[in-house]
Structures are given as structure tokens and as C-alpha cells.
Amino acid sequence: MSKKLTFQEIILTLQQFWNDQGCMLMQAYDNEKGAGTMSPYTFLRAIGPEPWNAAYVEPSRRPADGRYGENPNRLYQHHQFQVVMKPSPSNVQELYLKSLELLGINPLEHDIRFVEDNWENPSTGSAGLGWEVWLDGMEITQFTYFQQVGGLQTGPVTSEVTYGLERLASYIQEVDSVYDIEWAPGVKYGEIFTQPEYEHSKYSFEISDQVMLLENFEKFEREAKRALEEGLVHPAYDYVLKCSHTFNLLDARGAVSVTERAGYITRIRNLARVVAKTFVAERKKLGFPLLDEETRIKLLAEED
């Protein structure tokens, strides 16, 4: 590798590359979530017949992974670069390898392996065939071909490529700690994120009000159901995301037992499934507007 890209240059390079492949560049969704997959730009758009090609950076919060800013590789919040393409192009893996070359990683000079790792997200009723991508022994990306999202079978098949930006940047810049990553010229990752990492870890593990969080979960669940009764998919899904993050905070605090944990996951999954079904129904009412006219008319005629 010649020039060592900064963190933001890595993002800009990936944005330009996937833009050139026909992806819309979306912005991070403004609700807490544990992974880029949970953004409505993936969760909702992966279902139904309409095409969808998008790429975006998604800050992902995992309270249980916080380490007070002291662990060089474990974070309360990390950043994913998410690419979702429906229908999946036949050469998506080749495209991915080309993107690595643009980041200065020559596949012919490195040990790049696709290790089978089928993916499942129980809290959203989602699963798919998947591979971890290992670069010289370190996982940097997750590949998934969605089979089910929100309890619904996907069709056409959606491919998802999720880059772990911190790991990728650590490798490209040859640093052992994420906090030593150069975010921009002269500015280190740690100078931006060490303090919030410490504070969020302290809050998640020591300070959070368990009673309040339990009450909030109940309120968010009720509000999601109320929105769904009115056919309001996106407000409902916002509250599903709030339920998920609230559960993650409770889990990090040790406030839920093993049995209770399974119950909370089931409640979130049940909501996510209703959201998914309602979304497809609402898109059908709109006539699946992202489909080309010929396909749209044919599909609507078949379903009627």
C-alpha cells in the first residue's frame, strides 16, 4: 500500500466507488441501532419486489461492547459502511474486491478469504447466506444474501456488504489501536471518540436507570403498535428501533434474566414482522412506484 488513507478518505473512496456502481448515497438514519442492517434503508427496502441500490455510513451502537475507551478494539459505537443492492448483481464479490484495490489493498498481494458465516438477526426475524471476509487474518467485512427479512421471504434476492470501517482503517493505516486511527489530517480517532466511549460505557454499565428503561420499553412497544394500527410504517419502525436500543441498554446493565431476554427479543421480532408486512402492503397500494412500468403492471395484475 502506498498512501495511507485517512478514515474520512476511506469513506469518500467507498462512496464514490459505489456511486459509480449505481448506488444512491443515503445518510445515516437518525435513530440508535446496533447495525447498519437495521436502518430502514436496508430492513424495509430489502423486502418487496422493488429494486433498491444504496450505500451509507451507519454509526452502530452496542452498549454491551463498551470498554470505557480503554480497549483498542472494542467499542460502544463503531461505524459501518453499508451497501445494499436489490436485485443482487452477479458480480458483487468482484465489485467488492475492486473497492479494496481503490483503498490500496491489492487482492493479489494479500490473503483475502471468504469464510462461510450464515447471518441471523433474531430480533428482526431476518436471516441469510453469508460470508465473513478476512484480510490477512482479520475480519473486515460481512457479506450477506438475504433470504428472510422481518419474517418475509425476500425476492428478488438482496445482497448486503458491510465494511467494518474501524478495522479496515486500522489495517490500512497499520495501527494497533482504533484510537490511533487518523480520522482527518492531524486529528486522531481517539481525540474525537475517547470521551464519548468512556461516558457511554459508564452510563450503560453503571448509571442508567433500569426502572425508567423498563418503562420506556413498554411505552415504545405500545406506541409502535398504535402507529401500526394506523398503517404508519415509518413511525412504527422508529419505535421498534427504540425498543431494540432500550433492550440493549437493559442487557448491558444486567437488568434482564436469560428467560426475560428471550421474551424481549420475541416482542421486538413480532413488531418487526408486522412492520415488514405493513410496509409491503403500503408499497403495493402505491403501485410499487420504483418498479419499471412493464414489470409493475404485470406484477399488480398477477397479485390481483
UniProtKB/Swiss-Prot annotation:
<dbReference type="GO" id="GO:0005524">
    <property type="term" value="F:ATP binding"/>
</dbReference>
<keyword id="KW-0648">Protein biosynthesis</keyword>
<comment type="similarity">
    <text>Belongs to the class-II aminoacyl-tRNA synthetase family.</text>
</comment>
<keyword id="KW-0547">Nucleotide-binding</keyword>
<dbReference type="InterPro" id="IPR002310">
    <property type="entry name" value="Gly-tRNA_ligase_asu"/>
</dbReference>
<keyword id="KW-0963">Cytoplasm</keyword>
<dbReference type="GO" id="GO:0004820">
    <property type="term" value="F:glycine-tRNA ligase activity"/>
</dbReference>
<dbReference type="InterPro" id="IPR045864">
    <property type="entry name" value="aa-tRNA-synth_II/BPL/LPL"/>
</dbReference>
<dbReference type="Pfam" id="PF02091">
    <property type="entry name" value="tRNA-synt_2e"/>
</dbReference>
<dbReference type="GO" id="GO:0006426">
    <property type="term" value="P:glycyl-tRNA aminoacylation"/>
</dbReference>
<keyword id="KW-0030">Aminoacyl-tRNA synthetase</keyword>
<protein>
    <recommendedName>
        <fullName>Glycine--tRNA ligase alpha subunit</fullName>
        <ecNumber>6.1.1.14</ecNumber>
    </recommendedName>
</protein>
<keyword id="KW-0436">Ligase</keyword>
<dbReference type="GO" id="GO:0005829">
    <property type="term" value="C:cytosol"/>
</dbReference>
<comment type="subunit">
    <text>Tetramer of two alpha and two beta subunits.</text>
</comment>
<dbReference type="InterPro" id="IPR006194">
    <property type="entry name" value="Gly-tRNA-synth_heterodimer"/>
</dbReference>
<dbReference type="GO" id="GO:0140096">
    <property type="term" value="F:catalytic activity, acting on a protein"/>
</dbReference>
<dbReference type="GO" id="GO:0016740">
    <property type="term" value="F:transferase activity"/>
</dbReference>
<keyword id="KW-0067">ATP-binding</keyword>
